[in-house]
Regions:
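Active-site metal-binding motif and surrounding structural segment of the metallo-beta-lactamase
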Residues: 23, 30, 64-115
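Metallo-beta-lactamase
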Residues: 122-195, 239-251
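Active-site-proximal loop/helix segments of hydrolase catalytic cores
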Residues: 190-229, 233-245
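Conserved beta-strand hairpin/beta-sheet module of binuclear metal-dependent hydrolase folds
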Residues: 23-77, 205-217
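Divalent-metal (often Zn2+) His-rich catalytic cores of metallo-beta-lactamase-fold enzymes
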Residues: 223, 236-299, 303-340
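Active-site neighborhood of phospho(di)ester-bond hydrolases with catalytic His/Asp-centered motifs
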Residues: 58-60, 80-90, 115-117, 196, ...
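Divalent metal-coordination and catalytic microenvironments
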Residues: 36, 49, 59, 73, ...
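C-terminal regulatory/interaction regions
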Residues: 2-5, 289-439
Length: 439
């Protein structure tokens, strides 16, 4: 049983950062936070409360982890599960629900009550409508293995990735829903559920007054807030910052996130919440200021900066999402999809533009050579543009794809965020197959 509170205090108080795996641990290990509170660390954590009338769980993690989570919970408490609250409807938080339903049936206990925001069920319906797309983008985001496989994809030995489905075999929708607020009393414990948009439109955070504790879900994740994911639906940075400020005002003495380490101490918690809110607010304020002045999206992307002292915090490193992506999401939310470049309003096919550029350059080989030179000089953004044009102009050109694999592979290694690494790694693998060049 790890001393998670001691670990988080050391990281925060001393400004220590030992990599993303040190704060987001995937172990299914249960750690007791107090006699009535435990955290099971998994792909997303399960936070559990003893109430005197059964356990209350926040989230169930992924289906693949749920069995181990259940076993470790049972080693801690024999109490049946009374209620499961979904902090939001992402699959890494809800997919293990069936395990706890099955356990209740096998033990002759009542089915757990499932509680969530009214949009959770609508999210599941949307996931079914776009199931193939969600399987593909999660495979790409998480690098084609590991978490992607856990989300419904399968890979045979040496065979191409087989995309089966996204999410659990059966969606368990909340049977108790709410719009803005819901107060629950389970046993001797009160749970005040509050809706706030943030990473999703169906998110809740909970204040548990008897413990002076907050369950944050993904509103706190020990990385830069995931408000810009380039392959996912809309995020809400303004509302996210508001939620963090509301949590800060509670004066909590215990913070229980769904990813990362739990945090104890009123002042320490207030600082973390304030820093996260400030980081979102500064990206939002800079972006909206430039939008209101008529700037193009490209200019805003390359102008908005987050103060370095915030990015150095161990709980604000951009190792999952990053500020540049949040700018794109702010533009989409408040400004639509037209980026300010008239040529992009009704563009020519990308391949046609690439063929024209190759012709002007004197052939695809010229684009390849220049892309490699730019990559060697460290200008990876321009290098990627040119090598992408080369393969669009000549889709079967093995040397072009060899260069594309090299350049995207180099960029993948240099990037910090998992989202960037996933997309560039996917492009690298695509071209390696065509070029017949192994890494």
């Amino acid at each position: 049983m790890a001393d998670l509170l001691g670990l988080s205090a050391r990281y925060i108080d001393e400004g220590i950062y030992e990599g993303p795996g040190s704060v987001n641990r995937v172990t299914t290990e249960l750690s007791e936070i107090s006699s009535d509170i435990a955290v099971v660390e998994a792909f997303s954590h399960v936070v559990t409360f003893k109430t005197g009338d059964g356990l209350v769980l926040f989230d169930t993690s992924l289906e693949a982890f749920a069995g181990g989570i259940k076993d470790n919970l049972r080693a801690w408490s024999p109490e049946p599960v009374n209620t499961i609250a979904f902090t939001h409807g992402h699959v890494d938080h809800i997919s293990g629900a069936g395990t706890f339903i099955k356990e209740a049936e096998e033990n002759g206990n009542p089915r757990p009550r499932f509680v969530g925001h009214e949009n959770v069920g609508k999210r599941f319906d949307r996931y079914e409508m776009t199931n193939g797309y969600n399987a593909i983008i999660n495979q790409r985001q998480f690098g084609g293995g590991g978490a992607a496989n856990l989300m419904g994809n399968e890979r045979g030995g040496g065979k191409p990735l087989k995309i089966s489905r996204f999410g659990p075999s059966e969606w368990v929708k909340p049977d108790t829903t709410f719009s803005e607020k819901l107060a629950m009393k389970v046993g001797d414990t009160t749970f005040e559920l509050n809706h706030s948009k943030g990473e999703t439109d169906d998110h809740l955070w909970a204040w548990i007054p008897e413990h002076k504790a907050i369950c944050t879900g993904d509103l706190v994740i020990w990385v830069f807030p995931n408000a810009g994911n380039p392959q996912k639906v809309q995020r809400y940075p303004l509302e996210w910052a508001h939620a963090l400020r509301q949590m800060e005002a509670k004066g909590a003495e215990l913070l229980l996130p769904a990813h990362g380490l739990p945090i104890a101490g009123k002042e320490r918690i207030a600082m973390v919440l304030s820093d996260m809110a400030t980081a979102l607010e500064t990206v939002l304020e800079q972006s909206l200021k430039m939008m209101n002045e008529g700037a193009r999206l490209s200019d805003i992307i390359h102008s908005v900066k987050v103060p370095g002292h915030l990015l150095e915090k161990p709980y604000l490193r951009p190792t999952y999402d990053e500020p540049e992506f949040i700018v794109n999401n702010i533009w989409r939310l408040y400004g639509g999809w037209y980026d300010g470049n008239p040529a992009n309003l009704k563009p020519a096919p990308e391949a046609a533009v690439a063929l024209e550029m190759a012709s002007l350059a004197g052939g695809v080989e010229k684009l390849i050579d220049r892309a490699r030179a730019l990559a060697e000089a460290g200008d990876m953004r321009l290098a990627c543009h040119l090598v992408e044009m080369a393969t669009l102009a000549a889709p079967d050109h093995k040397e072009a794809h060899g260069a594309r694999a090299e350049i995207y592979g180099k960029r993948r290694k240099e990037e910090l965020s998992l989202m960037s690494k996933g997309i560039y790694g996917h492009a690298e693998r695509e071209s390696r197959k065509i070029s017949d060049v192994n890494e």
